[in-house]
A protein has these predicted regions:
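A compositional/biophysical signature of low hydrophobicity enriched in polar/charged and small residues
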Residues: 1-80
Length: 80
């Protein structure tokens, strides 16, 4: 199992309707476990898991292609 935190910047100003739409769209992606809207330079933090690297990469690609996502910055979680 592989996991990642994906830091997302939104394209829109972040009105409630846009936030709700993006929240639902991100939650609908296979592999996405949690979606948190946060204050600061990052608008959203997504936690995602995949059975292997290819599956996780596919999930991250789907996050990037979601309408309302301007950019992403991914942090792979290393098991310790």
């Amino acid at each position: 199992m592989m996991a990642a935190f994906v830091l997302v910047k939104m394209t829109a100003s972040g009105g409630w309707e846009e936030i709700n739409t993006l929240h639902m769209a991100l939650h609908a992606i296979a592999g996405v476990k949690t979606v948190h809207f946060v204050a600061g330079p990052t608008d959203v933090i997504v936690f995602a898991e995949g059975a292997d690297q290819a599956t996780l990469a596919g999930t991250i690609g789907n996050i990037r292609q979601t309408q309302g996502v301007r950019s992403t910055d991914t942090r792979i979680v290393w098991p310790v």
